[in-house]
Amino acid sequence: MSAWLLVDAGNTRIKWALVDSAADGWLAEGAALHADAADLAAQWGTAFGAAPPLRVLAANVAGTAVRTRLEQMLAAVAPGAAVEWFASSAQRAGLVNGYRNPAQLGCDRFAAAIGARALAPGRAVVVANCGTATTIDAIDAAGRFVGGMILPGLGLMASSLARNTAQLPQIQPGALLPSPFADNTDDAILAGCLSAQAGAIERAFARHGAVECILSGGAAPYIAPMLAQAPLLAGALRHVDNIVMKGLHAIVRAEGDPC
Ligand SMILES: Nc1ncnc2c1ncn2[C@@H]1O[C@H](COP(=O)(O)OP(=O)(O)O)[C@@H](O)[C@H]1O
Ligand SMILES: CC(C)(COP(=O)(O)O)[C@@H](O)C(=O)NCCC(=O)O
Ligand SMILES: [K+]
C-alpha cells in the first residue's frame, strides 16, 4: 500500500497529511501559515524519510501563486510524484454536487462534503468549516451536496469591524462568554461575531432538517462551546479536525491505489 500526501491550502493556512488507503491510514500531519510556507519542505522531509509519496492529492483555494509554490516544493521533496489538483466536479466518491455550475464550488467545500458523507453515510448533514471564511453546507441522506452559505470567518468578521470603524479595537479570539449581552467593547464584539457564526450554523441545521452537524476549521474551537449550548444541536454536534483532509482521504479510500 503506497502513501499519499494530501494537501488542503486554505486562505490562511496550508494543511497536509500523509496517509495510505486503509481506513485508519493516517500516518502524519502538519500545517503552516502562508507566510511560513517554506517550513513545509522541512516538515515533509521529516515525515517522508527515505520514502517520499508517489501520489499527491491537493485542494487549493488560495490561488495560482500558492499552487505554483507548492508545485515547486513538491518537485523538490517528492520528485516524480503524480500530483492531482482536486477540483469540484458533478460527482466524486459517491457524492453528487448540486451546484448549478459544479466547477464553481470551492474544491475545499466539495472535499469537506465528501468527508462529511463518509463520516455520516445515509444521514442529512450540515458541515460548517470555520476558516478564513465560514462555509455551511448541506448534504442530504441520499448523498447530494444540496448547497450552502459563505460568510466571513470569525477572524474576518472581527477584523472588519476594527478596520472600518473609528472606535472598535482588534480583538483576539476568546472563550465563550457567560452572557451574550456584554458590558464592554471587546466582549460585545466577541459576543456578536460568535453569535453570528453559531446562529448561521443553527439556522442551516434547522432549515436542512439535519441530524448531524460537523464542525471543523481553525476557528471551530471558539464556536463549538456556543453550539454545544444550543438545544437544537443536542447530540448532533461533532467537532472534526480538518474535514477537508478527511474528505480527500475518503476519496483515496474510495478510489484505491492505481496499479
Ligand atoms: N494559530 C492560528 N493561526 C491562524 N489562524 C488561526 C490560528 N488559530 C485559530 N485560527 C483561526 O482559524 C482561521 C483559519 O483556519 P483554517 O481552517 O486554517 O482556515 P483556511 O482553511 O481558510 O486556511 C483563522 O481565520 C482564525 O480565525
Ligand atoms: C469560500 C472559500 C473562500 C472558503 O475558503 P477558506 O475559508 O477555506 O480559505 C472557498 O471555498 C472558495 O473560494 N470558494 C469558491 C466559491 C464557492 O464555493 O462558491
Ligand atoms: K472555510
Put a short name on every predicted segment:
Residues 13, 59-66, 191, 210-227:
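Glycine-rich phosphate-binding loops at beta-strand->alpha-helix junctions
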Residues 30, 177-213, 237:
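Adenine-nucleotide phosphate-binding core of ATP-dependent small-molecule kinases
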Residues 78-85, 145-151, 232-243:
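Short hydrophobic/aromatic-enriched beta-strand-loop microsegments
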Residues 82-127, 133-134:
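Active-site neighborhood for divalent-cation/phosphate handling
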Residues 236-259:
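Glycine-rich phosphate-binding/hydrolytic loop that grips phosphoryl groups
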